[in-house]
């Protein structure tokens, strides 16, 4: 028998969400000559923080995911709060390590008082995606990738599977919605990204 056949057996959520299955179900486009590839319609958007924009070659590109890593306590969260405060548009700051009250206190000290800066304390990837659906931000900050988890996976936050799947899903969301996503990754004393070095 030829052709595609359907399977009567259900696919488990873990298999359905795996990177390998997603690659099979959503194959990449064919190779094209570089001159045939469309250039992005939206150039890099300045963040409002000059030095940060210089490092990023002009700002954040819609549809991209940027990893900001550094040792704990170095000021990553503070820098990102300043960034959402300077961002021109709605931003969603997801803290998986602190409560919204703690983040608000730090934001107050930095002078970030805008109604279009949305705060969320969440550990679940599905909650984060639902908030993106509901609020349609142009910038999403996830602090940090090692502490969020996909509830469909049977592994702890920060594990190889969780970090891979959560990062992969955030990349998909960024591309599908043409939004900029910033992910925080902690660095160990040895200088490597905490958890699996898969990002």
Label the predicted regions:
Residues 164, 168-199:
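Phosphate-binding/switch region of NTP-binding enzymes
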Residues 42-49, 73, 96, 156, ...:
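Conserved phosphate/pyrophosphate-binding and hydrolysis machinery centered on Walker-type P-loop NTPases
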């Amino acid at each position: 028998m030829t052709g595609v056949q359907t399977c009567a057996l259900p696919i488990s959520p873990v298999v359905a969400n795996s990177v390998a299955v997603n690659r099979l179900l959503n194959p990449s486009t064919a190779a094209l000559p570089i001159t045939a590839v469309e250039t992005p319609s939206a150039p890099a958007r300045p963040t409002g923080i000059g030095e940060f924009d210089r490092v990023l070659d002009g700002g954040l590109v819609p549809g991209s995911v940027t990893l900001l890593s550094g040792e704990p306590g170095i000021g990553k969260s503070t820098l990102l709060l300043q960034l959402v405060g300077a961002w021109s548009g709605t931003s969603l700051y997801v803290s998986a390590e602190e409560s919204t009250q703690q983040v608000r206190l730090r934001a107050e000290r930095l002078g970030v008082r805008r109604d279009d800066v949305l705060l969320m304390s969440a550990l679940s990837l599905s909650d984060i995606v639902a908030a993106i659906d509901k609020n349609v931000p142009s910038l999403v900050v996830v602090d940090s990738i090692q502490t969020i988890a996909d509830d469909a996976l049977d592994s702890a936050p920060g594990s190889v599977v969780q970090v891979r799947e959560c990062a992969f899903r955030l990349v998909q969301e960024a591309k599908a919605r043409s939004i900029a996503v910033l992910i925080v990754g902690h660095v160990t004393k040895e200088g490597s990204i905490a958890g699996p070095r898969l990002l």
